[in-house]
């Protein structure tokens, strides 16, 4: 909602909790925030997905490649708070630019390499949902600057290609 007031096209937000036991909790949080949403399992049953929503809640497992293939940009939620981050390599393989918070210790080298190659940006500043200033500013900047978004997307693909075959090298 914050972002939809600042860009011409209201972005569709896909929230995908890492753990299934959080699906109901996240649904409640979205509803409490006053946002219209559908669970992905309900949304696909709607003809042509034709429901006016702000958020699609990913409520099934094993579908991240599908979300990445449909995304213009990924915010790696597990890095915004001290949870250590998530695997950004899959997002990069789909050509998705990645926005990271400061907490990437579970994927520290991968995050540093992606940032260095221009596939990811680290957001610093206030990242709490109660005051997401830095996150909103960065999202708005990228969504309005398609050339930069495309540049990051190309860098994400290049990053993925450069990091293929790690098992063979070990």
What do the PLM-derived regions correspond to, one by one?
Residues 1-170:
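Nucleotide-activated sugar donor-binding and catalytic core shared by glycosyltransferases
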């Amino acid at each position: 909602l914050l972002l939809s007031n600042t860009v011409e096209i209201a972005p569709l937000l896909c929230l995908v909790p890492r753990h299934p036991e959080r699906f109901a909790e996240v649904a409640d949080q979205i509803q409490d925030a006053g946002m219209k949403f559908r669970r992905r399992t309900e949304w696909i049953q709607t003809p042509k997905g034709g429901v006016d929503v702000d958020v699609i809640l990913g409520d099934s497992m094993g579908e991240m490649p599908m979300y990445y293939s449909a995304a213009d940009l990924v915010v790696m939620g597990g890095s915004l708070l001290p949870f250590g981050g998530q695997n950004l390599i899959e997002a990069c393989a789909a050509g998705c630019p990645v926005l990271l918070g400061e907490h990437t210790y579970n994927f520290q080298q991968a995050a540093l390499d992606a940032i260095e190659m221009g596939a990811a940006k680290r957001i610093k500043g206030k990242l709490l949902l109660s005051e997401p200033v830095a996150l909103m500013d960065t999202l708005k900047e990228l969504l309005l600057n398609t050339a930069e978004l495309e540049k990051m997307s190309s860098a994400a693909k290049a990053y993925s290609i450069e990091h293929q075959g790690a098992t063979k090298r070990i």
